[in-house]
């Protein structure tokens, strides 16, 4: 993929993550000050659509990223580094190796990521926090997604039990059809040795 297509695709993904709305060429050019015309962006978007990176949910709508696009985005994402203060907080909490410290770590992770965190101490002992962070995201203005996520939360202990033994050390991204929690969201999972 050439640099211009990559820039357009990453911009579409970022905008869709922020708004949960289909993204149009004119909006991209205006909002992100792209140094190309909206006609050029439309042509590039047509090629990205042919390649399976974006889709048009209905006629005359903008485009939305596909699972293939999100995978590309994650593979090419530069890691966000924790600040020194954040890293020290995690080191201090994880050094204690007790359930209270792990819960505090999960809360800190939820705050920093502005997302939900699920922490399994073992197969049948689960803690979660940050659900309100998750539900404040723009895509949850759709009732169907709220229902989907509430079903996930209702059965999260069963899902954790199913994947617990298959988890590897180091982050794994579960996205779309590869995500046992829900195809409508992504999850980053890892195993941590006590």
Q: Over which residues does each language-model region extend?
A:
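Contiguous, well-ordered alpha-helical segments that form the cores/surfaces of helical PPI scaffolds
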Residues: 9-14, 188-190
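Conserved phosphate/pyrophosphate-binding and hydrolysis machinery centered on Walker-type P-loop NTPases
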Residues: 2, 22, 95, 99
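Short alpha-helical segments that sit at the start of domains
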Residues: 1-10
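N-terminal helix-turn-helix
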Residues: 14, 18, 22-76
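Intrinsically disordered, acidic Ser/Thr/Pro-rich low-complexity regulatory segments
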Residues: 78-194
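A short alpha-helix capping/helix-coil boundary motif
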Residues: 4, 21-25, 84-86
